[in-house]
Structures are given as structure tokens and as C-alpha cells.
Design a protein with these regions (language model features):
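Active-site PLP attachment segment
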Residues: 115-150, 162-167
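Local beta-strand N-terminus motif with an aromatic residue
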Residues: 54-56, 90, 122
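Conserved beta-strand positions
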Residues: 33-34, 61, 127
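Helix C-cap/helix->beta junction micro-motif
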Residues: 85-89
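Structural motif of enzymes handling amino- and sulfur-group chemistry
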Residues: 162-179
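PLP-dependent aspartate aminotransferase-fold enzymes
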Residues: 1-57, 77
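Conserved PLP phosphate-binding loop immediately N-terminal to the Schiff-base lysine helix
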Residues: 58, 62-75, 90-116, 130
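A glycine- and small-aliphatic-rich helix-loop capping segment at beta-alpha/alpha-beta transitions
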Residues: 8-16, 76-81, 108-122, 143-149
């Protein structure tokens, strides 16, 4: 829409439909895919970026699979290596907790999962589904200090505007599930 410097591109699962219907996604080969928990493959992707001189802007991971492989989880070792590599290369780490947040482990964030409590937070983490009680359109993004410093107010248009009723619902959900 002319607001972003570069449009985000989806992973392999959405590539076909986007290529067919959106000209800006055609002939793009900018997504790199690594199998969850394959640390050697993850390291190889970042090494390839170094060797070929390209920058990985963002690594996205879903800590507990929803649709693709329900219940499959990333390991702490994989998460830690992803965090290390993204920091070392200046990339952002995004954790997609849209489906799993609250439901997958009974807590909101990946850094609250059992065995992950002392893990370093991601740069961005997203939530929706359980947080909005299945009632109102609401997605939430949590930003680390580094990611917040990169955020430019006004660039993201209506995508990032508020919905007061949905926010009230999320607050009520959080109050109900917070010990």
C-alpha cells in the first residue's frame, strides 16, 4: 500500500496463493525455511547469509504448532540458538503465539513456558485467539525495547489501531487467568 519499505512475505505454506493473487509476491524467493528444532539447519541458514552477503531481517517461529503439526513444540535449545543467532546478526526474533498463547502451556509468553522461564525474551511476540476470548477482532504484539525503538508511529496505518471493546475483553481474560 505504499507505506512500508518492504512488504512482508509469507512462508512456504502461503506462497502459492499469494503468488497467484498478488503481483508484489510474484517471483520472490525471500523466505528461508528451517525445520523446527533442527539447530544445524538454523546455523547453516545464518552462515549462508554471511557467505552470500544477505541480511535476515526477521526470524519467525511458532513455539507450539497449531495447524501444521498440532502440539509439536520447539525445544529450549532451538529457541536459545535462534535468539543467539538473531542477536548476533542484528535480526529480529518474532514468536507467533496467536494460537498457542494462554492455551498451549497455560501461560501467555514463550518465556513463561516451563523450562523457558530464564530464556531471553524475543523481540516481538504476537497473541490473539484465547486472549480475545474468541469474541472480538483483536491481535496484540509485544515489543522488546529494541523492537519498540524501531517502531514508527503512523507507518502501519489502520493495522495497528485500537478496538476499545476488544481491549476490554483482553484485559478481562488476563485478569481471569492471572494467579
Amino acid at each position: 500500500r505504499g507505506r512500508k519499505k518492504r512488504q512482508a512475505s509469507s512462508p512456504d505454506t502461503g506462497k502459492g496463493p499469494y503468488n497467484a493473487s498478488r503481483a508484489s509476491f510474484r517471483n520472490r524467493d525471500t523466505s528461508l525455511t528451517v525445520e523446527a528444532n533442527n539447530i544445524a539447519a538454523l546455523q547453516a541458514i545464518f552462515a549462508r547469509a554471511d557467505d552470500e552477503g544477505f541480511f535476515i531481517e526477521l526470524m519467525a517461529m511458532e513455539p507450539i504448532q497449531g495447524e501444521g503439526s498440532p502440539g509439536s513444540c520447539i525445544t529450549r535449545e532451538f529457541y536459545d540458538e535462534a535468539r543467539r543467532l538473531t542477536k548476533e546478526h542484528g535480526s529480529l526474533l518474532l514468536v507467533d503465539s496467536i494460537q498457542a498463547g494462554l492455551r498451549g502451556q497455560g501461560c501467555l509468553s514463550v518465556v513463561d513456558y516451563r523450562g523457558f522461564q530464564d530464556a531471553e525474551e524475543p523481540d516481538l511476540e504476537t497473541w490473539s485467539k484465547a486472549l480475545n476470548a474468541g469474541q472480538f477482532p483483536l491481535s496484540v504484539i509485544g515489543l522488546s525495547e529494541r523492537a519498540a525503538d524501531l517502531y514508527i508511529v503512523g507507518v502501519y496505518g489502520n493495522t495497528m489501531t485500537t478496538n476499545p471493546r476488544a481491549l476490554e475483553t483482553a484485559i478481562a481474560v488476563l485478569h481471569r487467568v492471572t494467579p
